[in-house]
Swiss-Prot record:
This is Protein NDRG4. The lineage of its organism: Eukaryota, Metazoa, Chordata, Craniata, Vertebrata. GO terms for cellular component: basolateral plasma membrane; cell projection membrane; cytoplasm; cytosol; endoplasmic reticulum membrane. It is found in: Cytoplasm, Cytosol. Expressed in the brain and heart, weakly in the kidney; most prominently in postnatal brain where it is expressed widely in the olfactory bulb, cerebral cortex, hippocampus, cerebellum, thalamus, and medulla oblongata. Belongs to the NDRG family.
Amino acid sequence: MPECWDGEHDIETPYGLLHVVIRGSPKGNRPAILTYHDVGLNHKLCFNTLFNLEDMQEITKHFVVCHVDAPGQQVGASQFPQGYQFPSMEQLATMLPNVVQHFGFKYVIGIGVGAGAYVLAKFALIFPDLVEGLVLMNIDPNGKGWIDWAATKLSGLTSTLPDTVLSHLFSQEELVNNTELVQSYRQQISSVVNQANLQLFWNMYNSRRDLDINRPGTVPNAKTLRCPVMLVVGDNAPAEDGVVECNSKLDPTTTTFLKMADSGGLPQVTQPGKLTEAFKYFLQGMGYIAHLKDRRLSGGAVPSASMTRLARSRTASLTSASSVDGSRPQPCTHSDSSEGMGQVNHTMEVSC
């Protein structure tokens, strides 16, 4: 991979071009951070608030960041021709190895929201050796049946596409109150994302199949995510039930479940600081950025109790050579707490 690929790229895949934006340059053998946005959004609408945060930039300067836009969802995308077949959710996942290979990434840490979380989970199931860890926000592991399909069709007859998408993105309370954030996203979804292309992506997401994962030991030959996973959802978010169910199907020794209060449907937009703090501890638990300075701690602030628990659940010794030289570390799943908590072998649910 060249010294720096910073900027926009169109990557050829078996299912068409994929728009990708690279920020930064490779850092030794460290994984790339790869993001995938939710339906109705693109990488800018979904992740700009989070990745523009100063504390997040303190983290991402240690990695190359790769933002992936689903086909036809990027700013200024041309409308697909009549009869274009939008890739299935599984096909979207199988497009990602082309991105990884194009830039020479050895493996990635994925951050996905909603539909993007589903795509990244599918990617990790099909290509487990390419995925080092996953942060999955608002993921729904369940497929959509005929009843769901009919309900979606009916909703489409009585609501505009942007309003239908908003009901997927935001909590009922946010929609009823018609918050400034909801108004802003209604306007941007209507004007920034090509509506015909969005309709195709929306239809495909609502035709998805079950992820078909099960917690190890619950069924013979259970298939589940093998990498460390941090699940994130806001209180009363539309995806809350789906994320809870996903949590029940993952390996509890490598899964952290973060339920965020007062964050609504888009925690990466409404609570980017808390999410960044959790992400930092998640990375440290995998053996990365051990010596990252917390800007707020130098001013006398202390981490929230919930984040301290998250750190204890995800972090072991952070002074290993792997944290310094960028070689691939082994996921850490035990505590370094002085309180004698011992090995953590259960899902850590944290509310903050």
